[in-house]
Design a protein with these regions (language model features):
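Bacterial N-terminal signal peptides that target proteins for export
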Residues: 1-10
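N-terminal leader/targeting segments and the immediate start of mature chains
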Residues: 13, 19-61, 70-75, 205-212
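A short, amphipathic edge element
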Residues: 28-30, 46, 119-130, 183
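A short, surface-exposed beta-strand/turn
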Residues: 65-66, 71-72, 86-88, 157-170
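An acidic-aromatic
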Residues: 66-113, 181
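Flexible, surface-exposed loop/linker segments and immediately adjacent secondary-structure boundaries
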Residues: 107-139
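Gly/Pro-enriched, hydrophobic low-complexity segments
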Residues: 131-133, 137-211
Length: 212
């Protein structure tokens, strides 16, 4: 009887840790499912809002900007008011249309805003947990909270997933310095026709641009 009581007590003590591990795995599996689903898409067109908030005089000062993202397989092009980002699958570029300049930059997932690259960044080095659901714009959004195992800059990341479509809905990063960065999807189209030339850095669109 005492042995049974001790085992029961041990199970009660262990239960919170088992639940935490299960939640961790469920959240990570969901992110992996969304990542795998995103890879199956032939093309993507996303209109988004990017908002950066920073502490200022006891409050938060925010700056928002609109942009568009086009993806064709591994090729990505992001258009914003200030600059464009283009990755042709092997090299990445920053494009400044007003100055007619093109700068070669690092070609890795961290420089891209594509949903697949955002999700790929967080496949390891984080703890994961389900962070509740919300009804937004007629959609059911499941949130997943991530905490880096070792980071002096990032405190927490919150990723919102459209439960029905398994597509990225929003992404928020909270810095240890109080800065908050939010990527919100305004519209998301998949498998629509896209011109392959828009991912060609040597196309006539960039004729005469100065290469830095």
């Amino acid at each position: 009887m005492r042995k049974f009581a001790n085992m029961k007590l041990f199970a009660l003590l262990l239960f919170p840790f088992l639940v935490q591990a299960q939640t961790h795995n469920t959240a990570k599996d969901l992110l992996n499912d969304v990542y795998e689903h995103t890879l199956t898409l032939e093309t993507q067109h996303i209109v988004f809002t990017n908002t950066i908030g920073a502490p200022s005089n006891g409050g938060m000062k925010e700056r928002a900007s609109k942009g568009e993202l086009f993806a064709l397989g591994e090729k990505v092009r992001v258009k914003t008011d200030a600059f464009e980002f283009l990755s042709d699958g092997s090299k990445a570029y920053l494009i400044y249309p007003e100055d007619e300049e093109i700068e070669t930059t690092a070609s890795d997932e961290e420089t891209s805003l594509s949903p697949a690259d955002i999700l790929k960044n967080y496949q390891s080095g984080y703890s994961y947990k389900m962070a509740g659901k919300a009804q937004e714009k007629g959609k059911t959004i499941q949130y997943v909270a991530l905490r880096p195992v070792a980071s002096e800059e990032v405190k927490e990341i919150l990723i919102g997933i459209d439960v029905k479509s398994l597509l990225l809905e929003n992404y928020s990063q909270y810095g240890t310095n109080g800065v908050k960065t939010v990527f919100s999807v305004d519209s998301y189209e998949v498998n629509i026709p896209l011109d392959k030339e828009m991912f060609n850095i040597n196309s006539s669109e960039f004729e005469g641009f100065y290469r830095l």
